[in-house]
Amino acid sequence: FYNSASKIRVRVLSRNANDRFDEAFWARRIRYAVDYRRTVMGQDFDNCRLIFGEADGFPGLTVDRFGPILVAQVLSLGMELRKQQLFALLLQTLHAGGAQIDAIYERNDVKLRQKEGMEQGTGFVTLDGLRTDLDGHVTIRENGILYDVDYIHGQKTGFFLDQKYNRRAAAQLAQGKHVLDCFTHTGAFGLNCAAAGAASVLSVDVSEDALTTARHNAALNGLQDRVEYLCADVFDLLTKLAEQKRGAYDYIILDPPAFTKSSATVANAIRGYKEINLKAMRILPRGGYLATCSCSHFMTDDRFRAMLADAAKDAQVSLRQIEARQQGPDHPILWNVPETDYLKFYLFQIV
């Protein structure tokens, strides 16, 4: 479809000349997306990304499922014009498979909409059988951990589902470790480590609001005495700890926000990523563990690996790679759409 007000003026829906963009076409696309998640997510189908934009053939549309709640972001005019039809078809498909959906909430409070010539806004979707009077909170279970998801005020759709299996992988190294969980947001990595038997966990974030939610999540799981929370700038904290040389932590997790959202700021982002990784490597003892990631597709895997190699050289350590991971399969990577390949996640031992 075409939008003269957008920097992305043309978005391709299909390369099949025989396709007609009628209700049957959209119903088929939605069925493919839902059936794919049922297959790859299995028991985790209750909490996953149901529609991932171009990767599912819906350019500009994201839909996350948190149990009985669907949270949508509509970032292209073509999807905006069809959203009521798409929501109805998605609801129909989920109900046919036995899923109970109570509400759909739109999180269209994104500046990108203005670049598409659309207004920002949020609110419950009005469709037969859906509620519009909920308080904006839902409790989900991921990897055995309970979380209170605030889908009205939380970042993006309320919870970062793409790190689901990376959190589980990180927790497998945590038993008996003293963990420093940086950029914790609502506490997920730290809680996974605490539940896995970490000796101690310090979870750090610059946002007191995020830490309030993290503490609440810890209490939901009976882990409030196993995790300590600190409101601080991670860059400043790592600087102080690095000055102390090898410190009290033998496992550091770095899950920063995207340091770049455009190609113009990649160089600055590389410097930021290198700074936190270099300091983490200086803090960790030989034999310690590092989990590190980037969620920006502009920070390609080649750039990320080169940055890590430079940081290791400057820290005078070697990196023993344990795992290289990406986003979960509910965020599928379409090889001809590079933007869908965005999350890099590495587990290392410092040797």
Which residues does each PLM region occupy?
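Non-catalytic accessory regions of SAM-dependent methyltransferases
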Residues: 1-67
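Non-catalytic substrate-recognition/targeting regions of SAM-dependent transferases
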Residues: 53-64, 83-159
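Conserved SAM-binding loop of SAM-dependent methyltransferases across substrates and taxa
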Residues: 172, 186-199
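Conserved class I S-adenosyl-L-methionine
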Residues: 176-185
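Conserved SAM-binding motif I beta-strand of class I
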Residues: 200-205
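S-adenosyl-L-methionine
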Residues: 209-253
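C-terminal catalytic and target-recognition region of SAM-dependent MTase-like enzymes
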Residues: 248, 275, 289-351
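Mobile active-site "lid"/loop adjacent to the S-adenosyl-L-methionine
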Residues: 249-279
